[in-house]
Amino acid sequence: MIRETAINTEATDIKIAQHRTPPRVVDRGDTICIEAFIEFKTKTGPASGILRLIPDSNTPNNCKAWVLMTSLEGITGHEEAIGDHRPTGENYSRTFGDDNWLDLRNKAKAYSDHEPAVLVIGAGQSGLTIAARLGVLGIDTLVIDKHERVGDNWRKRYHSLVLHNEVYINHMPYMPFPPNWPVFIPKDKLANWFEAYAETM
């Protein structure tokens, strides 16, 4: 399966990622390995990955791949509308009397004259993340949830709940958590962030 996928991927220009932690020896799950962040190109778009190497017992002084995880970072020809590609906003301010940003947003949310291209079920972290990513690619996405308010999937849990993993691995695209947030985020703080994220993105 990997060989078949690799043929279609056409990975080229594989190199150590410049703006990540340099290769180092680490302990991962009681396995000592060399860990390296990589970046490369594919025929679909730019990609990144993490490679973990362990000693090869069959070949002295050589290593073999223990873990290889990759992520497609973009799609060539369908770049995200961020940074230099972001919208200017000029079309909202130059013509007085026409619809402004809020008018257009409310019309788009009503779906009275069109259907969404994508329907996402669940306004939790994954649902909001995919909707934000698709939105930045210009793909009309509607998110629905069984709860009345975005964030209620956390808000309605037990009173003392905080996230069980650290803030550093829970960031959402385009709007990372503020740097002064606690390492373990309380449920209501996270719920309110989800609600603000949905409105902003």
Regions found by a protein language model. Give the residues of each.
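Short beta-strand edge/turn micro-motifs at domain boundaries
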Residues: 39, 43-107
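N-terminal Rossmann-like FAD-binding beta1-loop-alpha1 element of flavoenzymes
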Residues: 108-144
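N-terminal FAD cofactor-binding segment of flavoenzymes
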Residues: 133-168
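Glycine-rich active-site loop/strand segments that organize a redox cofactor
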Residues: 155-192
